[in-house]
Amino acid sequence: MSLPQHESPPPLVAVTGATGKVGGAVAEQLRARGPAPRLVVRDASRAPGWAEDVAVATYGDYQAATAALAGVDVLLMVSASESADRLTQHRTFIDAAAAAGVRHVVYTSFLGAAPDAVFTLARTHWATEEHLRASGVGLTLLRDSFYADFLPELAVDGVIAGPAGQGRVGAVARADVARAATAVIGDLVAGDRRHDGAVYELTGPEALTLAEAAAVITRATGRPTVYREQTLEEAYASRSVYGAPDWEVDAWVSTYTAIASGALDRVTDGVERLTGRRPLSLAQLLADHR
């Protein structure tokens, strides 16, 4: 008499940033595919109502993070909110993932991550990548360009002001980053190892100057928006009124200087390769959000 065969449970996926734009979209897409992922959140009350497997932890709490990641096979690690100690938080969370036995981490990094990147926050992403590589955990890096969703938010009273010059940026929609992450995770869960150690550069379908982006915003929203060039000194002076710490002001200004440097003048096929569809243009993104 043959014994009944018991199938092993599917790999457990955990998603961080599940109450945010990218992590939340990935969580919803994975749920639609089934089974639903574990959501690692800072505040359980903000988790979506459908979530049954919710773990509470912050990136900087090693003990809580280790417990939250117990039994997890594949982890989407959405980069933490900008802060002075973000790198320390990232390293702590990666150490917790390794200790918990996580087999593979998909990390949302930044296009051009490097120790000397013009965009200051890209340096933190590079250091995070290096720590992830040293951890021994499997990895896939999604190096996103600036979010296209963020471009309209740069305007203050209809003016985008900064030292970006004629530089161009291949900004990518958050929705496309989420779809790309979901595709990678789906392959990993299915046992497809093509993404092991892979680095994907995710951009939109076009690289725009900020003046061109302002024109697109005007046409798509009906809100007159223009770009005004600033010197470096003007950029720092105009942002000093917010009382932000130096590291944050440096990050704000380097958003523009990174564009001016040409570092973000990139258009790749990363989104289409992973998702099978062309990425959204800024005009399409804004039309979808009307």
Model region roles, listed by residue range:
Residues 51-61:
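Rossmann-fold cofactor-recognition segment
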Residues 2-47, 60-63, 70-72, 81-91, ...:
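Oxidoreductase cofactor-interface core, primarily capturing Rossmann-like NAD(P)-dependent enzymes
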Residues 195, 233-290:
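A hydrophobic C-terminal alpha-helical subdomain
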Residues 56-57, 92, 276:
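Hydrophobic transmembrane signal anchors and adjacent membrane-proximal interface regions, especially
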